[in-house]
Amino acid sequence: VGLDHRVAVFARGEQSLREALGACSILSRAAEQQAAILACPGTRWCSRALVETNALADRIRRELGTRLPAGAMVSVSGCPNGCAHSAVADFGLSGVATARDGQRIEAFHLLTGGGRGRTAALAQPAESKLTADEVLRAIAARL
C-alpha cells in the first residue's frame, strides 16, 4: 500500500523480484499484491481541490490497509474532477466543501463498486458528505 502514483523497478539480472525483495527484511512483503491507495495532490498543490487528500489516504493505509482485499483500489480525489480516478475505484472518495452546524468542513462523497480492465464499471454513489472519521467507518463496514 503506498501513496505514490507509480513505481518502476529496473534490474540487471534475472533474479525474481520476490527473491530480491525477500532478502531485505523490511521489503519482504513488497512483492505481494496489495490494495492500491491513490490520492490527488489536494489543496496543498491544486487550486481546484476543495479538500486535503493525503492525510485521509494515509489514515486509510494505516487503519484499514491490512483489511483491504489484495488488488482493491481506494481513490481519494480532492474535487469532483476525480484526478485520482474515484469513478472507477472499489472505494472512490470525491472531496466536497460543505457545512455542519454553520461551520465549513472538509467532507467526501463515497462511491463504491467501480472497476478497471476486464471488470470495468463506474462506481455508484453510496454515501454523501462524510468527514474523514465517517469515511473510515463507512469503508470498514463494507469490508
Which residues are covered by each model-predicted region?
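Mobile "lid/hinge" segments at catalytic clefts and subdomain interfaces of large enzymes
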Residues: 87-143
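Small-residue-enriched alpha-helical segments and adjacent helix-cap loops
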Residues: 1-103
